[in-house]
């Protein structure tokens, strides 16, 4: 599905508003129906979106919302730097190794990274979108931290978690 759970959305909004100025650059990976733009776009003005499934870009008018919309697989997308990168309901759609590569690439290209995932959630093709298949349907709080040691839990409950970039540096980026 092109949308995500409502859990903690307002908390994420407040967290980012408290931490960052309005003029930052945000990358919303897996833009879907534009949930994070709708959540943040009235405060932060420079938000780019990445969406692999072209019909979502057209059906949800993403090009009228985001500063830039990239119709590309995040595994192949190369970018320089964003203040915040949001992976909202994205990594569960990638094999573990691919998700690890994507997050490792993003780690040194942002000040903050937000990763939102559903726990233990099977999903197949939705609305003719093969990219909706969950390849990590076994995600839990425990294996999220094992698979992605660069992240730490920010908000969560028994069915959904928001993770943020863990500060793994001592004066210089090390990942």
Write out the residue ranges for each language-model feature.
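Conserved helix-to-beta-strand junction in the class I
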Residues: 105-109
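Conserved N-terminal segment of class I S-adenosyl-L-methionine
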Residues: 1-81, 97-103, 129-146, 153-167, ...
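Conserved beta-strand signature within the Rossmann-like core of class I S-adenosyl-L-methionine
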Residues: 110-120
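Hydrophobic adenine-recognition pocket in adenosine-nucleotide-binding enzymes
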Residues: 90-93
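A short acidic, helix-capping loop that chelates divalent metal ions and anchors anionic groups
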Residues: 122-127
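A conserved beta-strand element that flanks and buttresses the S-adenosyl-L-methionine
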Residues: 86
